[in-house]
Curated annotation (Swiss-Prot):
Domain Ras-GAP: 316-544
Chain's gene name: Rasal1
Record keywords: Calcium, Differentiation, GTPase activation, Metal-binding, Phosphoprotein, Repeat, Zinc, Zinc-finger
Task of the protein: Probable inhibitory regulator of the Ras-cyclic AMP pathway. Plays a role in dendrite formation by melanocytes.
Modified residues (Phosphothreonine): T400
This protein's name: RasGAP-activating-like protein 1
Species, as recorded: Mus musculus (Mouse)
Amino acid sequence: MAKSGSLSIRVVEGRALPAKDVSGSSDPYCLVKVDDQVVARTATIWRSLSPFWGEEYTVHLPLDFHHLAFYVLDEDTVGHDDIIGKISLSKEAITADPRGIDSWINLSRVDPDAEVQGEVCLDVKLLEDARGRCLRCHVRQARDLAPRDISGTSDPFARVFWGNHSLETSTIKKTRFPHWDEVLELREAPGTTSPLRVELWDWDMVGKNDFLGMVEFTPQTLQQKPPNGWFRLLPFPRAEDSGGSLGALRLKVRLTEDRVLPSQYYQPLMELLLESVQGPAEEDTTSPLALLEELASGDCRQDLATKLVKLFLGRGLAGPFLDYLTRREVARTNDPNTLFRSNSLASKSMEQFMKLVGMRYLHEVLRPVISRVFEEKKYMELDPCKMDLNRSRRISFKGTPTEEQVRETSLGLLTGYLGSVVDAIVSSTGRCPLALRLAFKQLQRCVEKRFSGIEHQDVKYLAISGFLFLRFFAPAILTPKLFDLRDQHADPQTSRSLLLLAKAVQSIGNLGQQLGQGKEQWLAPLHPFLLQSISRVRDFLDQLVDVDEDEEAGGPACALVQPSTIVREGFLLKRKEEPGGLATRFAFKKRYFRLSGRDLSYSKTPEWQVHTSIPLSCIRAVEHVDEGAFQLPHVMQVVTQDGAGTSHTTYLQCKNVNDLNQWLSALRKASAPNPGKLVACHPGAFRSGRWTCCLQAERSAAGCSRTHSAITLGDWSDPLDPDAEAQAVYRQLLLGRDQLRLKLLEDSSLDTEVDPGRDSSATDGPCAEVLAQQRAATTHLLQVLEDLEQAHEEFQKRG
């Protein structure tokens, strides 16, 4: 039984942060750590004590993780960043409420003695002889200790306490992965029982030693199950700091843990779901999909939609699934102006489908224009209430401009950017994924059939543009970081420019139906350009759905990442491991990397025809590298194995911590199916005849640090896993099981009220046949859920 977990994290905002700069303000950002591994960094909000981030992350991780931490720092352009405070959440605290955490949490001070990490390997034996008890503690090694020295390492030693006695190991200099292999023996008087405590310290020549962590074992543990293995280091027990003086963060955190059964156990549920999409949708109230839509609340509907879309994508049935939901939605809609405007399961499913299969397409269309807006930083404003004439003067004019001058200049800039956006969209038909085009064609046909009158001639266009423009292009323009179009959020001026562009794209997506209405009359100068663009968009939508329905969108089961699909690309600094070579920072060379569904390739420039490729099937590990290995930050390693079984390591330096984590995540997901993955590797470099991490002298020595192949960031390129998605659907149905049982009772009571001698067609309530179908479908579904629940219990007992 496979085990998986994912953390949904939203860093919303901060309040009442302390000032760290002489100006009386701060430049705060937030680091997100999972078990001491940095997985994300928010943008820096300049000159603010109440920053708004609004950043979301999904982290896939193993079930044995321990804690999640948020560190708030003040960015300094010179010197080290100042630590403001931290929030630490244990796994138990996150799972205490099934809905997760959604609240303001006070920041607490960062106590160096509480900042511990890593593990220690011990083998403890309790012996008895005529002189009393003897405890033999074999201190083997430790790994991933906290760096306490400026070099990014420590000088660790272990101190063992038992009763009134204590002993120390030797000190090993400049390593976070010490190998002691020392046996310490302590004696205790007969008749006494004492706990065992092992502390790790960093030795300092000047000043006091720094605490690295501790483990403690009760007398009962020593007697019944003497410790032997790896043990996680813990901080000294201390009183909790209620905080408040350092400000607070508003966080949303939810942990989802699943134990995924073998595929055959989900087959009955899958058959029920597949039967749903193959049956009539308009009056369906009995299928599992119809019941799921009824049970799903607004809060979880988006997550459910994502799981269902992925499940049917993995089965090659995303088209029929979306068509089923579309037919249900259209049949229930009387006013075409409200079609797909709600957050129904149909709307959310189509929205998630666009993000899953169309993200690469979105990047190709919008990235060039978005990059121009960020880089050129032009001032644009049409609203006279928001015009800043002084800013316009600094940027565009020699003298003091008038509102009319600002409006004319802004209109020219805005139409220029908007023209580039429209040109990119209407010329992108050939780049739009086939699966998306087929889904839009089915959508248009269904809408056209329902609203066929001449007065509804635009509805077939609005149905598509409502998704493609209003739920895809416009949100990506408004918040490009959330769609991975930029690494940072926009500054206020650029954000306003993006808002104006997004409003214009929304107006085009609405086919100009609301032009001249509402309070934003200041957009009137833009109307001629918008009306001109709308006719081009209609032609584009006609071309988009002009596709042969017999074509298959990626075969029987559609993969999100095809072999030729570029998942990630950009410049990195590269260095290959060379036996006998000098591990210096000058050995890194700038290369342009592309990660596809087939390989990791690189060349001197993006246009360079000659490139070197690393097949994904050869990758055995993708891991962080300690900063001290090359005196460089943000370095990772890709460990590969050739046909002869020889290992090779390529070191890559990324531009920042987010770039590093995104490359790590993308490479780990791309190489996830590979056999023979390494369970440990070296986070350092081999130079001067030894590894910089663990100081071992053999180049071929076994790795000293565990690999983290299971830790990845969730995004559109996540591999499809139908079993995991089926498990998520089962979990959602399980939450609504009581409602299903209540529905079954209601249907049964209604059925008894139907007069058998009366024609069912004349009955005011539901007919007997429909009630019987509902009761049978609900009973069948409840039985499937019960069978799955029993299977989980059986596997739980075995494990």
